[in-house]
Each structure stands twice: as C-alpha cells, then as structure tokens.
Amino acid sequence: MPKLAVVLLVLLILPLSYFDAAGGQAVQGDRRGNGLARYLQRGDREVQECQVDTPGSSWGKCCMTRMCGTMCCSRSVCTCVYHWRRGHGCSCPG
C-alpha cells in the first residue's frame, strides 16, 4: 500500500511541475514573437490616455483598465507595450 501512495503522489506532482515550467516560459515571453504586444495594441483593449506620473522618464507603467490600474506613462504620446523580461510598460518616441 505505501508504494501505491508514493506512485499516486508522484503522478499528482509531476504534471504540476511541467505545467509550472510551461507557464513560466509563457509569462516571461517567447522569442518567436510578441503576441501579447499586438494584443494590447488592438483598438478594443480599453487603452486609456497616458498621464504624467514619472516626469522626465520615458519608461513607466501604462494606463490600461484591466492590466495596470492607475499607473501611467510619463508622457501622453507614449503607447502601451509588452517588453520581454520587463513586463507591461510604455514606449515613448524620442
């Protein structure tokens, strides 16, 4: 009976580790393309106008009702993007 319990425990834990590994890669981003960036830049994502929150900086969190809350870009000309390894943020010209 103890062997059966160990086998069942391994069968329960093993799939979780594979799921976590795949989930971690998906969150960090893949090098094949930036599908999330394209998703965020579509017109129906409820992107709000960026507000001054970090003066003088070209990087910050972007205003998105479902994603970033009240954290905003430094300038109104910035657009919301997804940067690999840095997460959601702003892309500002110049």
Swiss-Prot record:
Cellular localization per UniProt: Secreted
Signal peptide stretch: 1-24
Record flagged with keyword Transmembrane helix: no
4-carboxyglutamate modification, residue list: 46, 49
Disulfide-linked positions: 63-72, 68-80, 73-90, 78-92
4-hydroxyproline PTM positions: 55
Tissue note: Expressed by the venom duct.
UniProt keyword list: Acetylcholine receptor inhibiting toxin, Disulfide bond, Gamma-carboxyglutamic acid, Hydroxylation, Ion channel impairing toxin, Neurotoxin, Postsynaptic neurotoxin, Secreted, Signal, Toxin
Domain of life of the source: Eukaryota
Gene Ontology cellular-component terms listed: extracellular region; host cell postsynaptic membrane
One GO MF term attached to the UniProt entry: ion channel regulator activity
Principal localisation: secreted
Propeptide intervals in chain numbering: 25-45
Record remark on domains: The cysteine framework is XX (C-CC-C-CC-C-C-C-C).
Family affiliation: Belongs to the conotoxin D superfamily.
Subunit structure: Hetero-, homo- or pseudo-homodimer (identical sequence, different post-translational modifications).
Job of this protein: Alpha-D-conopeptides act on postsynaptic membranes, they bind to the nicotinic acetylcholine receptors (nAChR) and thus inhibit them. Through its two C-terminal domains, this homodimeric protein would bind to two nAChR allosteric sites, located outside the nAChR C-loop of the principal binding face and at the adjacent binding interface in a clockwise direction. This toxin specifically blocks mammalian neuronal nAChR of the alpha-7/CHRNA7 (IC(50)=0.25 nM), alpha-3-beta-2/CHRNA3-CHRNB2 (IC(50)=2.8 nM), and alpha-4-beta-2/CHRNA4-CHRNB2 (IC(50)=28.6 nM) subtypes.
Name assigned to this protein: Alpha-conotoxin Cp20.3
